[in-house]
């Protein structure tokens, strides 16, 4: 079970640094935009769920200048950053809200879009049902989330460390949704013309501590393992970092894989 309060607080604290460290998230945003353009949609009303600092909303505003864009994010710090970035003309369209409980009327939007957000939910059902609820007939739902395979190097190294350190404890890494789970959740929510696929994005860091710091800087620290208490917990983390560097390190540093699941469906 994911503690949503911890997620909210982490992204609240990471809001100011997010854009400087979210390189993969920016590439994902551009990919989802290319999917929208390929769909040929011309929405009049757009909802951005988990809008973060407003980067996607700005790009959507450039592409659809006459569209009314509403942004929601669970974290107060992110919503505040989005208001600053979007400027006064869009300030009234930014709200603090939960993807699982949208404070919005039924059938309002032609497009609901989200990137790098839904992986922080325990299940996808409520958020997908809410997205469908606020969509108008024939409205489009397009999203990207980090799926199973994300941080596979970190997970493999951490599990190896748990097995090698006596009383190392349990696996504390975040569980990401599989592509099949995403597709099934869309079907349960009642979406039609569903398309789901995944792509890998690989980011390189100088070393493992630098990677872990970057993840924490963008508020996503809950995706990385948390050391248990005491000496054994410290040994697990030390062993994990050494194993990561030995198994996966190279001339470019250490890789961190993000498996991005993209989904599109119509109401």
From Swiss-Prot:
The kind of enzyme this is, by top-level EC class, is: transferase
User: What PANTHER family does this protein map onto?
Assistant: ARGININE-HYDROXYLASE NDUFAF5, MITOCHONDRIAL (PTHR13090:SF1)
Ordered alphabetically, the record's keywords are: Biotin biosynthesis, Methyltransferase, S-adenosyl-L-methionine, Transferase
Which pathway does the database say it acts in?
A: Cofactor biosynthesis; biotin biosynthesis
Asked if the Swiss-Prot or TrEMBL record annotates the protein with the keyword Manganese, the reply is: no
Q: Return the similarity comment.
A: Belongs to the methyltransferase superfamily.
Q: Which organism is it from?
A: Geobacter sulfurreducens (strain ATCC 51573 / DSM 12127 / PCA)
Superkingdom in the source lineage: Bacteria
Q: One GO biological process from the UniProt record? A: biotin biosynthetic process
Q: What is its EC number?
A: 2.1.1.197
Q: Which Gene3D superfamilies match?
A: Vaccinia Virus protein VP39
Q: Name one GO molecular function term.
A: carboxyl-O-methyltransferase activity
Reaction(s) catalysed (UniProt annotation): malonyl-[ACP] + S-adenosyl-L-methionine = malonyl-[ACP] methyl ester + S-adenosyl-L-homocysteine
Q: Which gene encodes it?
A: bioC
The name this protein carries in UniProt is Malonyl-[acyl-carrier protein] O-methyltransferase
Q: What does this protein do?
A: Converts the free carboxyl group of a malonyl-thioester to its methyl ester by transfer of a methyl group from S-adenosyl-L-methionine (SAM). It allows to synthesize pimeloyl-ACP via the fatty acid synthetic pathway.
